[in-house]
From Swiss-Prot:
CDD domains: AsxRS_core, EcAsnRS_like_N. One of its GO terms (cellular component) is cytoplasm. Keywords: Aminoacyl-tRNA synthetase, ATP-binding, Cytoplasm, Ligase, Nucleotide-binding, Protein biosynthesis. Homodimer. It catalyses: tRNA(Asn) + L-asparagine + ATP = L-asparaginyl-tRNA(Asn) + AMP + diphosphate + H(+). This is Asparagine--tRNA ligase. It is found in: Cytoplasm. GO terms for molecular function: asparagine-tRNA ligase activity; ATP binding; nucleic acid binding. It holds the Pfam family tRNA_anti-codon. Coiled coil: none annotated. The keyword ATP-binding applies. Its EC number is 6.1.1.22. It comes from the Bacteria.
Length: 467
């Protein structure tokens, strides 16, 4: 074992009792007893709980330094690991030396003083909020989920592909994209028609931050069979809500020779795999969320893992909603995009389990989704989860060039702009499928937090790009 084990390694029993170690971290609290002892709670972020260090007043720097330690000071505490008589911890550290690495400049104005802070306040000090129990737990759970996603796809034979963040394509056809330009805004070059001349821009054409890696992912799926992307995406959607971010991470698998049914099975297997991983690997953090954020969060994930996914056609889902007798805020009729209240009714009240809604009207879905034989619906799916609603959206992709071209024209897109995407249908086309999972929305579901801005280190939203 290293001379500098983590707090996690010590508390989990990987360090033998009696071993001399040095622990590097930050002070969470200091408590002094009348018996001439000080109790330092030292954390290093490796796990939820701090390590209690017992410091005797015979240390040379006890009066000058130890008694001045406050929350946030960085220290290296050397000592012996011993069994702890205190409840709730198996071991503690009996210190023989305390080195103060960094002081907190003014403890009275330290933004992360040892007291309970509101979530809203923590957003204002996002550079310091990972020092709190809450955001530290979120960060570890986020890491665990990301690692589990990579493990799952690797075990399933998928290859990770890096897709570009700068693109000239609008995957969703929604137009809510951030433009990337190096043109001088004070003297923009103009065409004869008076429009901005993007041919003089850095890329020689109008360019944007990507809203999805899907189209690029499809090109590799049509060569490597199974691929996935996992990276940041951007939406210039002016939505200042608890569910939206302008910059967020997406998980997007694409696989060849796959139907919509294969797609739904992959989504179910992936979600259950990552939920199982977080419950097993981050027990302490999940117990914190269950105690302080959402008492049902662990039970909800356990039930999710144990439940077979229900499946329902969009048309049947509309019938269920119409016959429910419930008054929804948004009226129900065939052709609408299901709102969150409709999704949650289906998952929580009707099916009482995760549910895959499939075969949506073509007019509310993207151009690349495979047109069904009825000519009115596409082979699209949404996975709805109890407690949140939609968590995954996907489809079988349109592999027929003539149908794809017709859909593009119907939606006001120029097929020539997507010449490279159309090439996939010219040269050995295959049925293929994929889906998108908003990573932050997944973390919201796992932690029980109500606002998506708590689960990404530095949230980007309308009029908010601090830090």
């Amino acid at each position: 074992m290293s001379k500098f084990p983590t707090v996690s390694e010590i508390l989990s029993g990987k360090v033998a009792v009696g071993e001399e170690v040095a622990v590097r971290g930050w002070v969470r609290t200091r408590r002094d007893s009348k018996a001439g002892l000080s109790f330092l709670a030292v954390y290093d972020g490796s796990c939820f709980d701090p390590l209690q260090s017992i410091i005797n007043n015979d240390l040379a720097n006890y009066n000058d330094e130890v008694l001045r330690l406050t929350a946030g000071c960085s220290v290296i505490v050397t000592g012996k690991v011993v069994e702890s008589p205190a409840e709730g911890q198996a071991v503690e550290l009996h210190a023989t030396h305390v080195e103060v690495v960094g002081w907190v400049e003014d403890p009275d104005t330290y933004p992360m003083a040892a007291k309970r802070h509101s979530i809203e306040y923590l957003r204002e000090v996002a550079h310091l909020r990972p020092r709190t129990n809450l955001i530290g737990a979120v960060a570890r759970v986020r890491h665990c989920l990301a690692q589990a996603i990579h493990r799952f796809f690797n075990e399933q034979g998928f290859y990770w592909v890096a897709t570009p963040l700068i693109t000239a394509s609008d995957t969703e056809g929604a137009g809510e994209m951030f433009r990337v330009s190096t043109l001088d805004l004070e003297s923009l070059p103009r065409t004869d028609e008076g429009k901005v001349d993007f041919s003089q821009d850095f890329f020689g054409k109008e360019s944007f931050l990507t809203v999805s890696g899907q189209l690029n992912g499809e090109t590799y799926a049509c060569a490597l069979s199974k691929v996935y992307t996992f990276g940041p995406t951007f939406r210039a959607e002016n939505s200042n809500t608890t569910r939206h971010l302008a910059e967020f991470w997406m998980v997007e698998p694409e696989f060849a020779f796959a139907t919509l049914a294969d797609n739904a099975k992959l989504a179910e297997d992936m979600l259950k795999y990552v939920f199982k991983a977080v419950l097993e690997e981050r027990k302490d953090d999940m117990q914190f969320f269950a105690k302080h954020i959402d008492k049902d969060v662990i039970t909800r994930l356990e039930n999710f893992i144990a439940s077979p996914f229900a499946q329902v056609d969009y048309t049947d889902a509309i019938e269920i909603l119409l016959k429910s007798g419930k008054e929804f805020e948004f009226p129900v009729s065939w052709g609408i995009d299901l709102s969150s209240e409709h999704e949650r009714f289906l998952a929580e009240e009707y099916f009482k389990s995760p549910v895959v809604v499939k075969n949506y009207p073509k007019d509310i879905k993207a151009f690349y989704m495979r047109l069904n034989d009825d000519g009115k619906t596409v082979a699209a799916m949404d996975v709805l989860a109890p407690g949140i609603g939609e968590i995954i959206g996907g489809s079988q992709r349109e592999e027929r060039l003539d149908v794809l071209d017709t859909r593009m024209v119907e939606m006001g897109l120029n097929p020539e702009d997507y010449w490279w995407y159309r090439d996939l249908r010219k040269y050995g086309t295959v049925p293929h499928s994929g889906f998108g999972l908003g990573f932050e929305r997944l973390i919201v579901y796992v932690t029980g937090l109500q606002n998506i801005r708590e689960v990404i280190p530095f949230p980007r939203a309308p009029r908010n790009a601090n830090f």
